[in-house]
């Protein structure tokens, strides 16, 4: 039976965070009334000329530096010719033979736990281009409306090599790229508004075969979950087609989230179908070394550098370091917690940020920037766990109280609610003696080899202590008494 290998390459359109469009002064703000943010250049009125947005070029330079690519000192804009109702000029200004960014790579963390591994995905190129307008179909009863607000919005199209071999790797790549463009401040990453959208080129081939299979491009994937579902379906569809003796035809397909299936949109075009040629209205883009050096000096610490620091300086696992650098806001919050709680508590700090805080933020639909529990408050809570003032279970109650604004600090909540842990050995021993005397059956079961009986006794002691006894001391004292 043939063993199949999946081959995936991804093209990503990242909308650049500029105030105005790439070749005009019209606003890029999202959500305005249709056709209220389209000027003469965007409408392609006769006689208008494009003027390149300097900020868009700087965004491209930042990206190139972030992925270790070559930032071309000379690049050329080209006309990509095709007809579509929401493309007024009849062509899109893009780049073809001489893009602004060439090469580079992104390092991914794929999977979790024992199955986690690191993978490097190479990038082919990244080039600047303008977005098209938008066709609206819902409200026009057999007709289509055209909204040109989006026309001319600056995009950076990022093209990967076909280095991914599973939907998990593709999603890990998309997540890493999404985090990076947000981290370096060139794109807000809002997938619902179309600021970050991916096309996945998918093919299959027999394992061991060097030649690529025929690819089909899944267009406009605007969520990581849909990306995984779409690729998984497409892979199985292609395998079934080949095994039933049919040939795969190169095509562009769409993913339907309602059915979980891909459906053909059109046969796939090649570059020659677009008749690219240099745009005569735009001079070649020249980027001097001094400009690149200036942008380099303004670059923040990158996610990969921060991951290495978290792993090296704080002893975190590769998975934890990767999760904590999913966004700059998360990484900054975590570092602020560690700065107060101390490096010795780095692992519990990581756990609280990644698990408890993340779950509560997700439940309430909040971003970490809007967390009701500040980094200082969380650090204070972790310090009280570390010095045995409270147990982990009690800490969860304190966290909820802080979240709900029931105290300014962990200490205040602990004092107000009388949650301080009982660490007095004599007091805990008295509770243990009471529980052993009242639970002879559990004692007998434990001595007969039933480990569950021990857990039941621990639970009884904690219940008697109203959850405030030090769990380790309870365990130790029970073992001593039962061994005697």
Curated annotation (Swiss-Prot):
UniProt xrefs under Pfam families: GatB_N, GatB_Yqey
GO molecular function, one term: asparaginyl-tRNA synthase (glutamine-hydrolyzing) activity
Role description: Allows the formation of correctly charged Asn-tRNA(Asn) or Gln-tRNA(Gln) through the transamidation of misacylated Asp-tRNA(Asn) or Glu-tRNA(Gln) in organisms which lack either or both of asparaginyl-tRNA or glutaminyl-tRNA synthetases. The reaction takes place in the presence of glutamine and ATP through an activated phospho-Asp-tRNA(Asn) or phospho-Glu-tRNA(Gln).
Species classification: Bacteria, Pseudomonadati, Pseudomonadota, Betaproteobacteria, Rhodocyclales
PROSITE patterns: GATB
Name of the encoding gene: gatB
EC number: 6.3.5.-
Protein name (record): Aspartyl/glutamyl-tRNA(Asn/Gln) amidotransferase subunit B
GO biological process annotation, one example: translation
Family: Belongs to the GatB/GatE family. GatB subfamily.
Keyword ATP-binding: yes
Keyword terms: ATP-binding, Ligase, Nucleotide-binding, Protein biosynthesis
Catalytic activity: L-glutamyl-tRNA(Gln) + L-glutamine + ATP + H2O = L-glutaminyl-tRNA(Gln) + L-glutamate + ADP + phosphate + H(+); L-aspartyl-tRNA(Asn) + L-glutamine + ATP + H2O = L-asparaginyl-tRNA(Asn) + L-glutamate + ADP + phosphate + 2 H(+)
KW Cytoplasm (keyword) present: no
Subunit structure: Heterotrimer of A, B and C subunits.
Species assigned in the record: Dechloromonas aromatica (strain RCB)
């Amino acid at each position: 039976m043939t063993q199949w290998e999946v081959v995936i390459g991804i093209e990503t359109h990242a909308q650049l965070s500029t105030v105005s469009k790439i070749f005009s002064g019209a606003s890029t703000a999202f959500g305005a009334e249709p056709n209220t943010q389209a000027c003469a250049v965007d409408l392609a009125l006769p006689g208008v000329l494009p003027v390149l947005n300097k900020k868009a070029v700087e965004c491209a330079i930042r990206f190139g530096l972030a992925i270790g690519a070559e930032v071309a000192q000379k690049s050329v804009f080209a006309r990509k010719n095709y007809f579509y109702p929401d493309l007024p000029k009849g062509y899109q200004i893009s780049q073809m033979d001489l893009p602004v960014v060439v090469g580079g790579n992104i390092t991914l963390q794929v999977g979790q736990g024992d199955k986690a591994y690191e993978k490097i995905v190479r990038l082919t190129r990244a080039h600047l281009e303008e977005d098209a307008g938008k066709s609206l179909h819902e409200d026009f009863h057999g007709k289509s409306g055209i909204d040109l607000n989006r026309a001319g919005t600056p995009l950076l199209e990022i093209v990967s090599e076909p280095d991914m071999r599973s939907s998990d790797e593709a999603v890990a790549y998309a997540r890493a790229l999404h985090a990076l463009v947000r981290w370096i401040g060139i794109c807000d990453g809002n997938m619902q508004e179309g600021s970050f959208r991916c096309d996945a080129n998918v093919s299959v081939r027999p394992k061991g075969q060097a030649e690529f299979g025929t690819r089909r491009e899944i267009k406009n994937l605007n969520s990581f979950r849909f990306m995984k579902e779409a690729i998984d379906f497409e892979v199985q569809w292609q395998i079934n087609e080949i095994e039933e003796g049919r040939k795969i035809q190169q095509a562009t397909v769409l993913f339907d989230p309602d059915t979980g299936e891909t459906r053909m949109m059109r046969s796939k075009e090649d570059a020659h179908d677009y008749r690219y040629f240099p745009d005569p209205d735009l001079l070649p883009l020249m980027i001097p070394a001094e400009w690149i050096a200036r942008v380099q000096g303004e670059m923040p610490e990158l996610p990969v550098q921060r991951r290495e620091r978290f792993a090296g300086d704080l002893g975190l696992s590769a998975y934890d370091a990767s999760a904590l650098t999913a966004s700059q806001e998360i990484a900054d919050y975590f570092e602020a917690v560690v700065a107060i709680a101390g490096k010795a508590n780095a692992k519990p700090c990581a756990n609280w940020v990644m698990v408890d805080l993340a779950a509560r933020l997700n439940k309430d639909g909040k971003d970490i920037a809007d967390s009701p529990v500040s980094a200082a408050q969380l650090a204070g809570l972790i310090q009280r766990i570390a010095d045995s003032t409270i147990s982990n279970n009690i800490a969860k109650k304190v966290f909820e109280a802080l979240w709900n604004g029931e105290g300014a600090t962990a200490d205040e909540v602990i004092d107000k609610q009388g949650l301080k842990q009982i660490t007095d050995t004599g007091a805990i021993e008295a509770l243990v003696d009471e529980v052993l005397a009242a639970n002879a059956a559990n004692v007998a079961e434990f001595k007969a080899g039933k480990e569950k009986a021990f857990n039941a006794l621990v639970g009884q002691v904690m219940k008697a202590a109203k959850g405030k006894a030090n769990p380790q001391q309870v365990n130790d004292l029970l073992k001593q008494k039962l061994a005697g």
